[in-house]
Amino acid sequence: MKEVKDIWQFFENMNEYVYATDIETHEIVYMNRKTLQVYGLQSLEDAKGKKCYELLQKTLIPCGMCNNDRLSVGEFEEWHYYNPIIDRYLMLKDTLIEDSANGKKYRVEIGVDISEERTQDGVIQKY
């Protein structure tokens, strides 16, 4: 298996929002360029070590919609969410990856912006 840093590089130039957190601490370990840009960050160093809920949702406690306890390596959970911080409707795909070198698990979230495609029938769940 590739090293985790090689996996992060794969996401770097994607046109989707991608971030990864340490599943145990909620600390951000990776954000791709698009995600850094939408949150007004200059580099990954500006995000690393910060709690995902503090940076991405501007809250002091883990999000009520956090699905970390339902994620598994190799399987994706797909859901829709309106993010008021960035004012975008997103289709989210979440999974876990495991670092074969040390056994650590990371939550990876890929967000596809569906703001322009969203339908009028309320398929987007707002929290």
Residue spans for each PLM region:
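Sensory modules in modular signal-transduction proteins
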Residues: 1-26, 31-36, 127
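A generic fold-level signal
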Residues: 13, 23, 47, 87, ...
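Polar/charged side chains located within well-ordered beta-strands of beta-rich proteins
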Residues: 21, 66-69, 93-94, 107-111
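PAS/PAS-like sensory domain cap-loop motif
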Residues: 35-47
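Residues that scaffold the ATP/ADP-binding catalytic core of kinase and kinase-like folds
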Residues: 38-39, 55, 120
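Terminal output helix/cap of sensory domains in signal transduction proteins
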Residues: 50, 55-84
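Per-ARNT-Sim (PAS) sensory domains and their PAS-associated C-terminal
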Residues: 73-75, 79-93, 98, 103-105
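Sensory coupling linkers of modular signal transduction proteins
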Residues: 97-127
